[in-house]
Amino acid sequence: YNLMIRDGLKITAANTEKMHVLGAPHQFEFFVKRVITRFGDKPIALASDHSGFDIKKQCKEDTMALPYIDVGTFTNKSCDYPDYVLQVTKLIQTNECSHGISFCRSGQGANITANKVKGIISALCFDEYMAQHAIKHNCANHFSIPSKYVDKAKLESILEIMLNTSFD
């Protein structure tokens, strides 16, 4: 500050809700890629296996007012979730999408698969609390939703939380 004052710069103060102090280049990169970009700023990547197909369809038709890219599956015929979850993670890695949501029966398989991919922070979200904390405290960019435990009303509520929560 002394150098700034010496050079004639005026230092002022203002109240702020939160402040992020950045040090190393990797911290700045994390901030730009993950913190500034909020859920819904870019298209959301969607995927499901056969058991998550119906709730993904509801998500797209009834509750998703956001732009999205659906990578499949497109039927409720038996299929393997990793084939689709990995496509979602690729869209996040290439920055085409900022976040992804994968639907399967328990959410666990999609969550485990996504977390194996570099740069992906996936969280299992079966209620509003889990969704809020996944973003607020873990800066998650992928969400696994279990079709066995989440109905349409709960999904609407979870998506609303995701839209209105930011990383602290």
Protein language model features and the residues they cover:
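Conserved alpha/beta core of the MobA/IspD/sugar-nucleotide pyrophosphorylase nucleotidyltransferase superfamily
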Residues: 1-40
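Structural motif
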Residues: 11-12, 43, 77-87, 98-102, 121-123, ...
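C-terminal binding/interaction regions
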Residues: 45-54, 128-168
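Short, solvent-exposed amphipathic alpha-helices that sit
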Residues: 54-64
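A short beta-strand-loop structural module common to alpha/beta enzyme folds
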Residues: 67-79
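Helix-adjacent hinge/juxtasegments
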Residues: 88-124
